[in-house]
């Protein structure tokens, strides 16, 4: 079973290489890429089910056991992220190819989407710091290509900000890796967890943890958000959905992994700072969603706002808070894909990004109104939608930790997030007569189909929350309880650690 853990990363990589030679064969590219991601999703879910019912699996490349060799770790946290990511990439590929454009393969876009997916999945699966950096770079290089492909001045400006800030974040990450290796002498997650446990009062470790905090915050748009709104606003629908679903979530995943398994010995410093940054991020996101009439920018700030929710749960440093953060992270990958599909469909049908031109649209497309309601309630955390279980657990974590300011901010900003989208929906149903003059294009059947799939999944994830919570609880216990991790992952390292 352990050998199968490489497949979720290997299959998209092989497919990406093949697509280089099928650039002008749109039908072959479409069938190959979508089929690959469907198979990838099925394999990932099968591995996740196995891990939840048994124990985490590891793969040591070249026969070199940790901490000396390259290792992949498949636990509930990593495989949950891989499964959800593979699923949304499948829909995003279908969305992109569904347009039926002859130039869909121009600039090898499907190839770079798959390479970005390789970097994302590799980041989830890797079990050592240096390879995490390598996977981040694969992901970022592919994203640099995707965000810079355009002919407008607006897109070029957004791309420059995106590239510069992410390069700075990568430098900080590499600096943190070097400092940690010099101090601790290992890069493997399991070995790091063991050694750091005996260095609780080391101020150097606390300083290093803050370097990682800033580095991952730049990836997750936690306070350091300047690159996100402009970059997402200029991308086409499938790329915006891809970035919203995955790019910031990899940074959030890294924060969860590092500040539960590794850097949890000085919560009065690290986790207090996480809570503070989460609160600032929620405030920034709340102002952003009500400040613009551009629906793409509203959606971009919704991404920032949700990162604040996730990190608030992590910062509580409680089982319930971290459990809620993991649940909400997985949920948000799906919900943000749905949100950007909805926003992209609005722009497609109306031809405008300003919501004032959407008057009467919902009357022409009743199903679209239903999809919009689902995404609003999911973002707001209204039961029985998928955002509810995660937010309840984050609430519990905040109360347990005595973080009433963060709790109040989460409630208020959740209402603001819903208001910003209800405002758009109100125009869609009850807008003034000027909007009626817009000639709306009908929504293609394939887009309705993809929206339907996401709507069903969002509803199912809320209704079947106990099933998902079993996975997230397992992930939380494994990463927050050191004895559980050591009993299940790389047990041979106990001998290495004492030599």
Swiss-Prot record:
Compartments in which it is found: Cell membrane
Encoding gene (name): mnhD2
Q: What is one Gene Ontology biological process annotated in the Swiss-Prot or TrEMBL record?
A: ATP synthesis coupled electron transport
Cystine pairs annotated here are: none
Record keywords: Transmembrane helix included? yes
Q: Which InterPro entries match?
A: CPA3_Na-H_Antiporter_D (IPR050586), NADH_UbQ_OxRdtase (IPR003918), ND/Mrp_TM (IPR001750)
What membrane topology does this protein have?
A: Multi-pass membrane protein
The protein's organism comes out as Staphylococcus epidermidis (strain ATCC 35984 / DSM 28319 / BCRC 17069 / CCUG 31568 / BM 3577 / RP62A)
Chief subcellular location equals membrane
> Is Cell membrane found in the keyword set?
yes
Q: Which is one Pfam family of this protein?
A: Proton_antipo_M
Q: Which GO molecular function, any one, fits this protein according to its record?
A: NADH dehydrogenase (ubiquinone) activity
Keywords from the named record: Antiport, Cell membrane, Ion transport, Membrane, Transmembrane, Transmembrane helix, Transport
Protein name in UniProt: Putative antiporter subunit mnhD2
> Subunit info?
May form a heterooligomeric complex that consists of seven subunits: mnhA2, mnhB2, mnhC2, mnhD2, mnhE2, mnhF2 and mnhG2.
């Amino acid at each position: 079973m352990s050998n199968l853990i490489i497949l979720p990363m290997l299959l998209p990589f092989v497919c990406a290489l093949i697509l280089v030679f099928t650039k002008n064969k749109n039908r072959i590219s479409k069938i190959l890429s979508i089929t690959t991601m469907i198979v990838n999703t099925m394999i990932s879910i099968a591995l996740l089910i196995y891990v939840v019912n048994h124990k985490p699996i590891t793969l040591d490349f070249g026969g070199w056991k940790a901490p000396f060799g390259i290792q992949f770790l498949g636990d509930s946290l990593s495989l949950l992220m891989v499964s959800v990511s593979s699923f949304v990439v499948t829909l995003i590929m279908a969305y992109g190819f569904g347009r039926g454009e002859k130039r869909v393969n121009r600039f090898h876009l499907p190839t770079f989407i798959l390479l970005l997916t390789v970097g994302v999945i590799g980041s989830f699966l890797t079990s050592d710091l240096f390879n995490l950096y390598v996977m981040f770079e694969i992901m970022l290089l592919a994203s640099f290509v995707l965000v810079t492909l355009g002919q407008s001045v607006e897109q070029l400006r957004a791309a420059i900000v995106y590239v510069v800030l992410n390069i700075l974040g990568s430098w900080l990450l590499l600096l943190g890796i070097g400092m940690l290796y010099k101090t601790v002498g290992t890069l493997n997650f399991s070995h790091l967890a063991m050694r750091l446990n005996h260095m609780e009062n080391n101020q150097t470790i606390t300083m290093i943890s803050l370097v990682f905090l800033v580095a991952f915050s730049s990836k997750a748009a936690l306070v350091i958000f300047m690159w996100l709104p402009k970059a997402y606003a200029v991308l086409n629908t499938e790329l915006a959905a891809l970035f919203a679903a995955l790019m910031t979530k990899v940074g959030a995943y890294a924060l969860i992994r590092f500040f539960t398994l590794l850097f949890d010995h000085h919560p009065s410093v690290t986790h207090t700072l996480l809570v503070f940054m989460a609160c600032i991020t929620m405030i920034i996101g709340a102002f952003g969603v009500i400040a613009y009439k551009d629906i793409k920018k509203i959606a971009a700030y919704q991404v920032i706002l949700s990162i604040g929710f996730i990190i608030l749960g992590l910062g509580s440093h409680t089982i319930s808070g971290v459990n809620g953060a993991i649940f909400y992270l997985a949920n948000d990958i799906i919900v943000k894909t749905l949100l950007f599909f909805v926003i992209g469909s609005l722009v497609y049908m109306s031809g405008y990004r300003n919501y004032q031109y959407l008057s009467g649209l919902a009357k022409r497309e009743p199903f679209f109104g239903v999809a919009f309601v689902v995404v609003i309630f999911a973002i707001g955390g209204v039961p029985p939608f998928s955002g509810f279980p995660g937010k309840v657990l984050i609430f519990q974590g905040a109360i347990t930790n005595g973080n009433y300011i963060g709790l109040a901010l989460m409630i208020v900003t959740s209402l603001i997030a819903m208001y910003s989208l209800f405002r758009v929906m109100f125009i869609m149903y009850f807008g003034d007569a000027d909007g009626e003059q817009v000639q709306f294009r009908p929504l293609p059947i394939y887009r309705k189909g993809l929206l339907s799939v996401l709507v069903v999944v969002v509803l199912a994830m809320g209704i079947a929350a106990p099933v998902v919570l079993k996975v997230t609880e397992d992930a939380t216990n494994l990463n927050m309880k050191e004895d559980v991790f050591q009993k299940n992952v790389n047990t041979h390292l106990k001998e290495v650690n004492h030599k």
